[in-house]
Amino acid sequence: MAKLPILMYHHVTVEDGKGLTISVENLEKQFNHLAENGYKTFHLKELLKLKELPKGKNIVITFDDGYVSQLDLALPLLKKYKLKATFFVPLDFLGKTDTWNTSSLEIMTLEQLKSLDSKIVELGFHSFYHKKYTELSNAEIEADTRRCLEFVSENGLRFSPVLAYPYGKFPKEKARNEIFKKTLKINGIEYGLRIGNRINSFPFKKPFEIERIDVKGEFSLLKFRQKIRFGKLF
């Protein structure tokens, strides 16, 4: 089975980055590394059609929360280095700010989402209300998922059937986990992404527990290179 690292980013800034915020300078260094070393990027919907990955270095780039900074700072770099990415968007917050976090960072508007080039950016779900699934009932999770689907349909958006769990949280107790996965499947979701910080094998053994590497703003390029090769560093 082939190895497939999936990167997770959030806010991008022109200043120094830390934690979930990365500087545009460091982001460019990382994207340049991927391009210079021949990494092939995929949209998640492309993986749904594949039984195996092509030979060589493969990777998936994801951004959570739909920040305007991703449009302003990350998108030009994706274009420059000919990379693809998936933007996971909490739909109730379009045109607002990240009230679950700092309340100061702007989320893209509906019009900005529609302006994204689908050849470069794939849109995926990040729930509707950005709440932890571990703190919601099964009925609330289903209602949230259905609201996402309704919103996308009502507004003429094109989303892939992929979902990144807010905070990386999902029900792990066996009975609840089975209901959770069934709920997502019934509503057409085919991939669910957590965090985990491990390198995936492809095809995915657990398509609703796909792991991502949390790229911290303070990572050096060396640490980034180690993370995409090994995942968790002990």
Where are these regions (language model features)?
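Histidine-centered catalytic micro-motifs
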Residues: L7-Y9, E122-H130
